[in-house]
Amino acid sequence: DYVIAFTVIGLAGFLRNKVSNPSAAAVTGTVGVCALRYICHVISGGTVWAGVSIPSTDGLLYSLSYNATYMIPETIINAAAVFWLFGCLNFRSEKISVAKKIEKNLAETVSASISILSLMVAVIVDAVAVFASLQNPDSGVLDFSLISNTNFTLVGIVSAIGIVLCVVFAIIAKVTSNSAKKVN
């Protein structure tokens, strides 16, 4: 369950020399290995753990659902973090250095960073709100029938705020980028 699933993370750089845009290569690699990791966890859950810690009836369906509850938010957060990191740092040279665009336009970088961070925070808060309500307080077992206990008003508000902030700061980053190009 863990050895193979976490070993595939080492494959994240498989597109490094095949895609010219470092951020695109890193994000695609990250999403790809998260998908592989999800598949490993599902196979393990549906075969090894069925009947032990997972109900044996519908073990595969339970494993698909259970593993999606943490792999989907984790994939979104990892992809956003990798996108931000590869936009800020240059990993293509012998020594890791600050990306040239940051040196040229700090306002764009800060705005883009806040944009990504607001989306990541919204995903984390939403995941905590949803998944906390899915855990049976008596047994501690994940119980999808408890989904009605989720405060979807909170989830909707947090999602909306996160998306609005993400878009607003992305626009600010684009505007500052365009104005910096006009100055140069």
State where each predicted segment sits.
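Loop-helix junctions at membrane interfaces
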Residues: D1-N184
